[in-house]
């Protein structure tokens, strides 16, 4: 039986930290579904469709990675894809506390799906989409934080927003 994992996130936008986890996960699992979820507590800069397009572009060399979007419970999505695992990246201890809550709830909802945590490489331990957006908003250098296509999309978003003030 093939090992299938779901790697969820808001990916608003996708960063090198996200890609680190996706690439490493693709080496461990036979198939990885990278699924864009909408976090109801966040207002996204990019639409779900835009985030899917960016993820497809930056993962196109990973032949066992499929990008998708979903609204609903992650465990329901995982079950629909016959996934037995949820893959999550951890940056710091503070991430772990939040992730434990989510993992515990997912286990209550579906005990057949295991959550696997992967530590982000040290060079990305500080990195978050929020930080990237803040730096990009003020024209800071983000070339070492996100792929070129994401950097261009951010510059375009913020230039468009500035022109409509």
Swiss-Prot record:
Gene3D superfamilies reported in the protein's UniProt record: HUPs
Biochemical pathway: Cofactor biosynthesis; coenzyme A biosynthesis; CoA from (R)-pantothenate: step 4/5
Pfam families in the cross-refs: CTP_transf_like
Annotated GO biological process: coenzyme A biosynthetic process
Protein EC: 2.7.7.3
EC class (word): transferase
GO CC entries: cytoplasm
UniProt key word Transferase: yes
Residues annotated for substrate binding in this entry: 10, 42, 74, 88
Cofactor(s) needed by this chain: Mg(2+)
Enzymatic reactions: (R)-4'-phosphopantetheine + ATP + H(+) = 3'-dephospho-CoA + diphosphate
Keyword terms, alphabetized: ATP-binding, Coenzyme A biosynthesis, Cytoplasm, Magnesium, Nucleotide-binding, Nucleotidyltransferase, Transferase
Superkingdom field: Bacteria
Compartment(s): Cytoplasm
Major subcellular site: cytoplasm
UniProt site positions, description: Transition state stabilizer: 18
Molecular function as annotated in GO: ATP binding; pantetheine-phosphate adenylyltransferase activity
SUPFAM superfamilies: Nucleotidylyl transferase
Binding site for ATP: 10-11, 18, 89-91, 99, 124-130
HAMAP family in alphabetical order: PPAT_bact
Family (UniProt): Belongs to the bacterial CoaD family.
Assembly and interaction partners: Homohexamer.
Functional summary from the UniProt entry: Reversibly transfers an adenylyl group from ATP to 4'-phosphopantetheine, yielding dephospho-CoA (dPCoA) and pyrophosphate.
Name of protein: Phosphopantetheine adenylyltransferase
Protein's gene: coaD
């Amino acid at each position: 039986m093939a090992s299938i994992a779901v790697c969820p996130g808001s990916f608003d936008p996708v960063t090198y930290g996200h890609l680190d986890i996706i690439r490493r996960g693709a080496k461990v699992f036979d198939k990885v579904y990278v699924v864009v979820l909408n976090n109801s507590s966040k207002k996204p800069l990019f639409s779900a469709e835009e985030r899917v397009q960016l993820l497809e572009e930056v993962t196109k060399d990973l032949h066992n990675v499929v990008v998708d979007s979903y609204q609903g419970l992650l465990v329901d999505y995982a079950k629909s894809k016959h996934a037995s695992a949820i893959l999550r990246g951890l940056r710091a201890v503070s991430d772990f506390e939040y992730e434990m809550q989510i993992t515990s709830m997912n286990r209550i909802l579906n005990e057949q799906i295991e959550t696997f945590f992967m530590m982000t490489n040290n060079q990305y331990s500080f990195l978050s989409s929020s930080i990237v957006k803040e730096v990009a908003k003020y024209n800071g250098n983000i070339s070492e934080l996100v792929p070129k296509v994401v950097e261009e999309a951010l510059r375009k978003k913020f230039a468009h927003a500035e022109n409509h003030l």
